[in-house]
Amino acid sequence: MEGPSLRGPALRLAGLPTQQDCNIQEKIDLEIRMREGIWKLLSLSTQKDQVLHAVKNLMVCNARLMAYTSELQKLEEQIANQTGRCDVKFESKERTACKGKIAISDIRIPLMWKDSDHFSNKERSRRYAIFCLFKMGANVFDTDVVNVDKTITDICFENVTIFNEAGPDFQIKVEVYSCCTEESSITNTPKKLAKKLKTSISKATGKKISSVLQEEDDEMCLLLSSAVFGVKYNLLAHTTLTLESAEDSFKTHNLSINGNEESSFWLPLYGNMCCRLVAQPACMAEDAFAGFLNQQQMVEGLISWRRLYCVLRGGKLYCFYSPEEIEAKVEPALVVPINKETRIRAMDKDAKKRIHNFSVINPVPGQAITQIFAVDNREDLQKWMEAFWQHFFDLSQWKHCCEELMKIEIMSPRKPPLFLTKEATSVYHDMSIDSPMKLESLTDIIQKKIEETNGQFLIGQHEESLPPPWATLFDGNHQMVIQKKVLYPASEPLHDEKGKKRQAPLPPSDKLPFSLKSQSNTDQLVKDNWGKTSVSQTSSLDTKLSTLMHHLQKPMAAPRKLLPARRNRLSDGEHTDTKTNFEAKPVPAPRQKSIKDILDPRSWLQAQV
């Protein structure tokens, strides 16, 4: 049988305070060790900022120790007064409201400088270190330290502080601490000071100081740190935030200011603090109760029942057909409001038929909407009734925070300032173009590129990763027929600018295939005309040599596929300008020739015929 499940706060067990007692004692031991480590850091600190942050952390440790001690005393009192009685009456039972999350963020504290102080740049103004402490029960949180001078008009804290286990009666005490950071007031030579203390403090005084640390006297520790290191944070202002201050927007709160103009830590506060305080009760953000219920329906005067998986959360009862619909984020089949106007009645009178029903009545203008549900047994009915009454109590305690779920916005951490992450010298080396590290990395890149392209990177013959769109026209699937042009002695020879040999195409269908006899006739014709074209051949030789030198001096073109030419028929004796013909159409780059082929005189003669 599928029974309901309780997802809210369960009943407190008898051994729970003892477990909390152990956890708090562990936290106390941790803070004591943290405080000892901070004292060691203070003895080694040489910079002003280091001393300021260390003293601030020491104050936080002492505040947490005091809070843990008070909480431990409260738990001991609860154990002594705890009783095991259980009240069966749900209405009159003593209840405890559910816990919730409280988030405080975007704190702004305006300053009220005089015009002469704010706009005056005649001399360097005083600087102050400001931070906030948030205290609620045993929880103590702090913000970052903010430096303030007369040019600042608002003290801004970007931290988001979240209290996870807060009740509706929470009280968050906000304390603003200030310290003047003038060089004369802060000791920056702790080693000399330690040597001086070693020679001037007697053994009896040293034993008193060590006993103070061992006895965990927080006030004496703070006084000792301020006396030795010259840094002391003073309470500048404070306020208390409660449930009435919670709102899903910015709100202004009054501050109680301490000190006056004569105090070294004093700042001209306006008297207000603006922040965003958000409350998320567990009854709004989590499922208070869940289980299967049978809903009664009237269809044409007949009573029928449908089984639904119901979830009680945020002042509403969401009804689904199955639990899987919740994970799939399917819209619920039925939503029943559960608020302070809702009336719930148990109808457990028919013991023979074993029917356990309850009705949910929501008044609306002019009428009342009633939903009847049935459970499987009496135990489930008691659990559902207990969950409803607890939910009513939670809604009444958290008040306006249960009208709508407030969202907690957690901002991403900002980048720290540049001077906190690296030194100026490292930034200079990163920006320098003459850095040996930069040259070495460039050499490695070139060497890697040469290895990847098998040396073709140096001569510009690395192929493209993706061919251009028009490359499909030159995939080699088309036949190419080229008809050579016959040169006469009187005409000037035409020279290919690239001087490269094309791949021999297939012979045309109307021509005879190659034979040795035809080749011998061609050689004989060349020998007969050798004397007549001596001047032309000399010019051709010079042109070939200059072309060769030109190719050796510049990078060679990348090999590409041949251009599929159309089948052109030329009449006998017709002369065609080869250069003009190739300029009219895109010509692919010819194949690369070796040095042996370029220096062969027979290739020069073939280029002219």
Swiss-Prot record:
One Pfam match, by short name?
PH
GO CC terms, sorted: cytoplasm; nucleus; plasma membrane
Tell me the GO BP annotations in alphabetical order. hemopoiesis; negative regulation of intrinsic apoptotic signaling pathway; positive regulation of cell population proliferation; positive regulation of NF-kappaB transcription factor activity; positive regulation of non-canonical NF-kappaB signal transduction; signal transduction
| PROSITE patterns cross-referenced by the UniProt entry | PH_DOMAIN, REM_1
Please tell me in which tissues this protein is expressed.
Expressed in lymphocytes, CD4 positive T-cells and bone marrow-derived cells. Also expressed in lung, colon, thymus and brain.
Q: Where is the PH domain?
A: 286-393
Coiled-coil annotation reads 56-91
According to the record, what induces this protein's expression?
Up-regulated in cells resistant to 25-hydroxy cholesterol (25-OHC). Down-regulated in lymphocytes activated by treatment with phytohemagglutinin (PHA).
Keywords, sorted A to Z? Coiled coil
What are the start and end residues of every segment in region (Disordered)? 495-520, 554-609
The UniProt entry, under SMART domains, shows: Hr1, PH
Here the segments flagged for biased composition (Basic and acidic residues) are 569-582
Please report the stretch or stretches of sequence annotated as the REM-1 domain: 5-81
Function statement? May play an important role in lymphopoiesis.
Q: What is this protein called?
A: Rhotekin-2
Question: What species was this sequence derived from?
Answer: Homo sapiens (Human)
Organism classification: Eukaryota, Metazoa, Chordata, Craniata, Vertebrata
Q: Quote the gene name from the UniProt entry.
A: RTKN2
